[in-house]
């Protein structure tokens, strides 16, 4: 969880059958620029610092999930990522707009599978997450 997706730097670990299928059928890897490679090396050299950031993400993710689950109108999905996905059902457009009015940026995903009103909130700083949770509380009571 080094947060380097924007650089198109990542990896996956899987069995040979899956990696062969992935490489030959689904997607070829992106070529890496020198800047991307240097950023990856720098991130690995700072892994202790990154582990601290991961701990903060885990703590804040748990707090967001627990708070969102207090609202019957939300279906909150378990997460191990640096974001939380939840279905706000028919009120997702209203929730998205109300948060946007307060300068809180989340992702409106809409329909995913059988879920009609999916929203995604990235895990930020404790202060950012508190602002998000307060806005939700003010909106839904």
Name these PLM-found stretches.
Residues 29, 83, 113:
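Residue-level detector of flexible, active-site-proximal loop/helix-junction positions
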Residues 57-58, 68-102, 125:
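Conserved PLP-binding catalytic core of the aspartate aminotransferase-like
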Residues 32, 106-108:
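Hydrophobic residues in well-ordered beta-strands that form the structural core
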Residues 77, 108-109:
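Beta-hairpin "wing" of winged helix-turn-helix
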Residues 1-69, 74-77:
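PLP-dependent aminotransferase class I/II
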Residues 6, 80, 113-117:
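Short acidic/glycine-enriched loop/turn segments that link adjacent beta-strands
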Residues 98-102, 111-141:
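PLP-dependent enzyme catalytic core of the Aspartate aminotransferase-like
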């Amino acid at each position: 969880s080094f947060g380097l997706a924007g650089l198109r730097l990542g990896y996956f670990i899987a069995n040979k059958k899956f990696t062969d299928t992935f490489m030959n059928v689904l997607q070829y890897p992106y070529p890496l620029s020198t800047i991307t490679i240097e950023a990856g090396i720098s991130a690995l050299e700072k892994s202790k610092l990154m582990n601290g950031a991961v701990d903060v993400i885990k703590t804040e993710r748990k707090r967001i999930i627990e708070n969102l689950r207090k609202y019957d109108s939300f279906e909150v999905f378990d997460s191990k990522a640096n974001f939380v996905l939840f279905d706000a059902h028919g009120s997702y457009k209203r929730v998205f707009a109300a948060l946007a009015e307060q300068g809180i940026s989340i992702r409106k995903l809409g329909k995913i599978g059988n879920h009609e009103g999916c929203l995604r909130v990235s895990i930020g700083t404790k202060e950012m997450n508190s602002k998000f949770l307060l806005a939700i509380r003010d909106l839904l009571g």
